[in-house]
Amino acid sequence: MSGSTHGFDAFPPVSGDAAADVASILAWHRAVLDQIERGELPALTARARTTFRERALLEGLTTTWSKRYFLVALQVFDDYQVKSSCFEDVPHFIEHVIESFARNRRSGQRLVFKHHPLDRSYTDYTELIRRLARQHKVRNRVLYVHDLHLPTLLRHAKATIVINSTVGFSSLFHGTPVNVLDDAVYAVDGLTVALPLDQLWRARLYVDRDAFKRVRAYMIRENQGNGSFYRRLPGAGL
């Protein structure tokens, strides 16, 4: 490779013909993608390659597979809420979900695991999920994503599965049912799915919007305060 420290030429110059410009830019992008697929751009990290691949997945999940996949929200590996749960660790949870899905799924359903963004530098479950999916003969039905927009995934999922993550409450906010496999503050009768996991895959699911509004109003009024561990919040005094 030559001509650039990044392994590809700079953006093509703009000419007077708009159509030719567009074609030239698209050809440049295609050349870059080809180099990525061949592993010829070492300056691009694995994360960048994953992002390119996942953007294509999102279109399918929001169209063809909308409301036909179950979203599994993974938590950080050392989350105390995981350590104190009914699961030994996150891999144990992953195995439990894949086994149940393989036994009870309907035709045309998919399972999507979403990695926790704060766990990106510490864990990667690619090989585990691939091995379990192959072992249980659901290899073509299981996806593992890292960087896709969580609210979009929640809105288009048939249901969300969590150990006890607060993602479950976000799922309810977006109108998507939640199956909580351990204890969570929002796991109350009439709000979350009160079914064993094996029964979830074939059940008719819905969110009681009135119940959600009542629980949300109570938590805002009695239980929650504005704050963040990660950034300052204007007006919160933090």
Predicted features along the sequence, with ranges:
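Leloir-type glycosyltransferase catalytic cores
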Residues: 1-36, 190-238
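Beta-sheet entry/capping signal
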Residues: 69-70, 108-110, 159-160, 177-178
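Catalytic donor nucleotide-activated moiety binding site of glycosyltransferases and closely related
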Residues: 102-144
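A nucleotide-sugar donor-handling region in carbohydrate enzymes
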Residues: 1-80, 86
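Short catalytic/ligand-binding loop motif for oxyanion handling, primarily in non-cytosolic enzymes
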Residues: 79-82, 119-122, 170, 187-190
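A donor-sugar binding/catalytic signature common to diverse glycosyltransferases
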Residues: 146-192
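Short, glycine-/Ser/Thr-/acidic-enriched flexible segments
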Residues: 77, 118, 167, 185, ...
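Active-site donor-nucleotide binding/catalytic segment of nucleotide-sugar enzymes
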Residues: 63-95, 99-102, 108, 115-119
